[in-house]
Swiss-Prot record:
InterPro entries: ConA-like_dom_sf, Galectin-like, Galectin_CRD. Keywords: Lectin. CDD domains: GLECT. Transmembrane segments: none annotated. Residues 32-161 form the Galectin domain. It comes from the Eukaryota. This is Galectin-like protein 2. GO terms for molecular function: carbohydrate binding. SUPFAM superfamilies: Concanavalin A-like lectins/glucanases. Monomer. The lineage of its organism: Eukaryota, Metazoa, Chordata, Craniata, Vertebrata. The gene is Lgalsl2.
Amino acid sequence: MAGLGANSDVMVKLDDGHLNNSLRSPVQAGVYFRGHIKGGMRPGKKVLVMGIVDHNPKSFAISLTCGDSEDPPADVAIELKVVFTNQQVFRNSCISGESDEENLAFPYFPFVPDQPFRMEIFCQQPCFRVLVDGHHLFDFYHRIQTLSAIDSIKISGDLQITKLG
């Protein structure tokens, strides 16, 4: 099954344009998702992504960004890239077009083909705390200090999105 593709022309938006509703049915393969985080991030706020990994995945990515501009590209507060070929999770940010060095960031690899997952990204004062299926995966210290500017989410790759919150 093909995955959510970054080059896809199909856009999926929630009814009210905000990331505070469940999707009525899974977002099918071949879709690139962009959504708005109502009010932006702040300490104590959580972003929930539930999905099912495709049958034969290569990778998927989840990014929290400052807007959804493509030109110039929006600042990326945190990008999580899950790569199945070598079972790695990378984390990164990109501010004013300058990417940090990608950090390999996991004590274990929690993603399994054809299986559901629940990822929670908690915004805390010094960092994002990322949990998968209730287990701590890593902390990522903020590179963007104005947390409320982090108001968009992008998801692409080899997965189906079943719920956002």
